[in-house]
Amino acid sequence: MTASFDVIVIGGGHAGCEAATAAARMGARTALVTHRLSTVGAMSCNPAIGGLGKGHLVREIDALDGLMGRVADAAGIQFRMLNRRKGPAVRGPRAQEDRKLYAAAMQAEIREAANLVVIEGEADDLIVADGRIAGIRLIDSRAFKTGAVVVTTGTFLRGLIHLGEKSWPAGRVDEAPALGLSVSFERIGFTLGRLKTGTPPRLDGATIDWAAVEMQPGDDPPEPFSVMTSRITTPQIRCGITRTMPATHEVIRANVHRSPIYSGQIRSSGPRYCPSLEDKVVRFGDRDGHQIFLEPEGLDDTTVYPNGISTSLPEEVQLAILATIPGLTKVRMIRPGYAIEYDHVDPRELDPTLQTRRLPGLFLAGQINGTTGYEEAAAQGLVAGLNAALAAGGGDPVVFDRADGYLGVMIDDLVTRGITEPYRMFTSRAEYRLTLRADNADQRLTDKGIAMGCVGAGRAVHHRAKMAALSAAKALATSLSVTPNEAARYGLSLNRDGHRRSAFELLAYPEIGWGEVAAIWPELSAIDPGVAVHLEIDAKYDVYLKRQTADVEAFRRDESLVLADVDYDAVPGLSNEARARLERARPRTVGQAGRLDGITPAALGILAAYLRREARKKTATASA
């Protein structure tokens, strides 16, 4: 073998960039293997980062010193906080990105990262020795030795593009697929499935009639993703909004038999929550129109991404569709939309560190695990990279659970339940939404990142200063109080019960905000506005957070009951069905067992009682 590394990451997309830099931050000698450095960090589909649920993941990546938030801030050309009118728990930061700036910023991060080298080439085979991963071989026969491999191949594993009746092998447009790795996975014993995703046509913005569409500005001022970004300096743009028309739907209905999805050419599952335009028309036939967001792809690029009309219909049909849409009747299509099928591994083959159970030292992240989306991929990449570095160095693994963050929710969903279609993150997937907010990701995760060694010194100093300021602000707000009569002088109506209420308690009232309490106590005006926002949210949710804390403690009790090496045939009282499901899934804890289909509360009680009995036996044996 020509060289040796602690960790090798295959693939330079969103998962691969986070995995490689996370491993490198942990001190592992890391190599990132990618076809070309010039395509590292490319946004293959939509030119946007974040959104509902997804924005939470970006903030969590940032809290652990990952790249996506900082890079998105550097390249963002329109920032919007989605669900702003709803509670903070379900708000989702989102940014429209300049594709070229995003890739350039990501490539700069990769080039400047310590402990990281980039190897241009195609990984073709996994090398196994003594029952664990030992290295990789490239298609040009170069081989590299390693202690851990992270595979982040996106849509490249036996990728097949579909456009109308035509199809051809590709990882994405104009790029070859990865064929050898699929063979390698099958040789090792993995069963590969097929999934599908799609992308819309790209349009020439210079030929769009912008006067015929609604224009949508971003937030002013824009709110960054990263706590390390003081302000956004990139020029901001507006997006357009238009709709499909009944005439659009007629064109689609007349040609739907030519869509690979409906002709039988594609049999794999696509993302339920990001359907193709032909899917929308067939499934929602009563709708007279579907919204389309016209998203510019860059400040010096006229290309526009029409979000909402992903399609794989033939090129001439796509042109006919566009001609029926307001603002697009004379548009020039730069590139047609298409669908792509690719191989994936059943994520139930993984443990919560994203290491495969079948082959120690092999980690998987991103679309190979059945997810869809840049943010889902990046979060998995970070977790896989951290754990690959720990595995290569002989350290203890790090597991993020469902109470830690959305990245823990996603990974637990994947490794426990598996997937039948591409997995996308939503806030509704999290049980502890009030705790797992986008605004407090650093409060939840950065201390953990500092302890494990993946957070740099600059961020650690910034975080400690912020937490000290928040603590001091809460102490001040808790120390200041008024009676109901005193509050009435400031126009605040409270229950006349004679009880004094602190500024923090007043903030819990829906109609009382920071401005009202600062009017009573001018000293509160000296508190940093960002800290004040956090304090007000904490106050509004305080009583509910206390209840949720009890729920989290109960969850963690179940998670602490470890099922390692349990012989389920030796557990009396379990049904044959429960035994079979537990043996097949091999859950890590009683809590994880409870999230398996078909495992009843009675079965969980039997498992908990069995573990307690076994623990008592071990204690008795040790003391004898």
Swiss-Prot record:
- Please name the GO terms that the record assigns under molecular function: flavin adenine dinucleotide binding
Q: Which Pfam families match?
A: GIDA (PF01134), GIDA_C_1st (PF21680), SAM_GIDA_C (PF13932)
Entry cofactors:
FAD
Q: Which keywords does UniProt give here?
A: Cytoplasm, FAD, Flavoprotein, NAD, tRNA processing
List residues binding NAD(+): 270-284
The UniProt transmembrane annotation reads none
Q: What does this protein do?
A: NAD-binding protein involved in the addition of a carboxymethylaminomethyl (cmnm) group at the wobble position (U34) of certain tRNAs, forming tRNA-cmnm(5)s(2)U34.
Protein name in UniProt: tRNA uridine 5-carboxymethylaminomethyl modification enzyme MnmG
Its source organism is: Nitrobacter hamburgensis (strain DSM 10229 / NCIMB 13809 / X14)
Gene transcribed to yield this protein: mnmG
